[in-house]
Amino acid sequence: MDNKKIVLLIIFSTSLLFLWDAWIKEQEKFNNPPAITQADSSAGSTQSRNDDSLPVPGSELTSSQASPDTNGIPASGGNGDSVTPRLLPSGEQIRVVTDKVIAEIDTIGGDLRRLELLQQPSSEDKDTPYALLYSEAARTYIAQSGLVGEGLPNHKTTFRAESDIRNYELSSGEDKIVIRLLAPEAQGVQVIKTYTFHRDSYVIDVGFEVENKGDATVRPFAYFQMLRDGNPPPAKTMMIPTFLGAAVYTEEGKYQKIPFSDLDKNKADYPANANNGWIAMLEHYFLTAWLPQQQTPREFFAKRQSDNLYSAGVIVPAGVIAPGEIAATTMPFYAGPEEQDNLEGLAPGLDLTVDYGWLTVIAKPLFRLLSFYHSWTDNWGVAIILLTMTVKLLFFPLSAAGYRSMAKLRLVTPKLKRIQDQYKGDRQRMHQAMMEFYKEEKINPMGGCFPILVQIPVFIALYWTILAAVELRYAPLALWIDDLSSPDPFYMLPLLMGISMFVQTKLNPTPTDPLQAKIMQIMPVAFSAIFFFFPAGLVLYSLVNNILSIAQQWKITKMYGTAPSKDTPEPPVSKQVNSSENPETTANSPADSPKQPQTPANNPRKMYKRTRKK
């Protein structure tokens, strides 16, 4: 049992080292992306387009074939360093403040150039709102939209605000704010671009009103895209890097991620044409997504615009507009945190953007239960404690069986040591004798390992739950723990967890191998050091789980009494395992020794009964 347990601990520790190595490599990749030649304009669309398919924005719209300077974004230098974008051309700024966001709209292109989330603190300063969209000297992440067609306005057109107001604020009694931007009339077509901000919502409706004042029918298409660089957002160090890139969802293809690296290599694979689904840009905790109405034709696209600059979006028909008629099209745009309850109600599959890794089947129910406890306590730390107690209760029968097995092993450890000493020159015979002894005493040597194996997936799933849940971002417990999603700043929880592990080792059977005994003594220190980098919420779970395990194990160990002293007479050992043994080597074997009287002192089964009666 000791050997198996050591192997499990070593495997787990090695896995953590591999994860750390992967994290280092990922950070190096982010810091030093390779220089890549200009991508083909068709990058991202993996399905051939029919003649009647929706048009894709050409170079006059997305500058996919033009010089990068067309969009105001220079190509990277020859050293392969990350691109440092120039500021995009700027016109007048329109500022909108609601109860959820602060937004800035630029009249050039009518782009949404900045969006701050009032209820989400910045990673650098808790008193500053988190900026999800921005157009700065070193970073670019904006939302663009326009119409496809000759003379129609796109994201390079200079719009004019219909109102003279440049600062809007949602006042009490108002449910929404509407911004109207007028494009210059061209070829008898008048276009008005609209933004509608809603109370208590991260959804912004972006629309176009097209009036045909000419003599010919027009058939415009509207495109909506997100443009961003490939730099990860500022965040505290995490053990495992989270996904940064695009994602698309359709009923046929389901949820698919589109890494920026695939766009760099022109190898992105996703469904381009559908009548359902959405497309998004993802980063840790937050996302932006265009959400077309169901059962309307659409074409998704994702492409590399230039070095370290990517776009993802959707194209939809804007109607068939006869002379003298007006048509309107609207596209909901979600820009906010990955709050699972809200995402589920916005669009099918949008909640899948919350990445739980390969243990989603376990992590998702864990978060549901965690949210349920939070609704009671209004404290995510207390909710984690209650979740730990629930998981411990579910595994109580398995844990009890394992601790009973370890208690029995603790009682017979001196006798096992005698068997090992007697057969130390023959490992095969020693193993056979020990297995026979386990069988006679009805002890399962692996009984203590199985509960550990079962709980490891739960531990990993909870790690991903804490890592992915924006609800735990800056969620406090008490005292110095003000962010359960980040490491303990004073390392108190990891130290307490290490102490609890040390206490657990004292309750376990002492390994007969001196090397194993030393390893077991080092393990609490090693794991404490590893947990310095883990989120405080996960360390809290481990600490509470260890405390509950210590209480359970101590109770069961007490039921079985203490281990016998080294002076306890030898137990009867198994029969002779090889009848052809040399008599000289087996003369003093336990099989030929006089039979000892069966007293409680040397009969473990009777001793168990005696301790139970006590």
From Swiss-Prot:
List the cysteine pairs that form cystine. Answer: none
Sorted alphabetically, which keywords does the UniProt record give? Cell inner membrane, Cell membrane, Chaperone, Membrane, Protein transport, Transmembrane, Transmembrane helix, Transport
Q: Name one GO cellular component term.
A: plasma membrane
Instruction: State any single GO MF term.
Output: membrane insertase activity
Q: Where in the cell?
A: Cell inner membrane
Q: Which domain of life is it from?
A: Bacteria
Q: Name one GO biological process term.
A: protein transport
User: Which regions span the lipid bilayer?
Assistant: 6-26, 380-400, 450-470, 484-504, 524-544
Q: Where is the composition biased (Polar residues)?
A: 34-48, 60-70, 575-602
Q: How does it sit in the membrane?
A: Multi-pass membrane protein
The UniProt annotation puts the region (Disordered) at 34-87, 562-614
Q: Which Pfam families match?
A: 60KD_IMP, YidC_periplas
Quaternary arrangement and interactors, per the entry? Interacts with the Sec translocase complex via SecD. Specifically interacts with transmembrane segments of nascent integral membrane proteins during membrane integration.
Q: What does this protein do?
A: Required for the insertion and/or proper folding and/or complex formation of integral membrane proteins into the membrane. Involved in integration of membrane proteins that insert both dependently and independently of the Sec translocase complex, as well as at least some lipoproteins. Aids folding of multispanning membrane proteins.
NCBIfam families associated with the record: PRK01318.1-3, yidC_nterm, yidC_oxa1_cterm
Family, similarity comment: Belongs to the OXA1/ALB3/YidC family. Type 1 subfamily.
Q: What is this protein called?
A: Membrane protein insertase YidC
Q: Which gene encodes it?
A: yidC
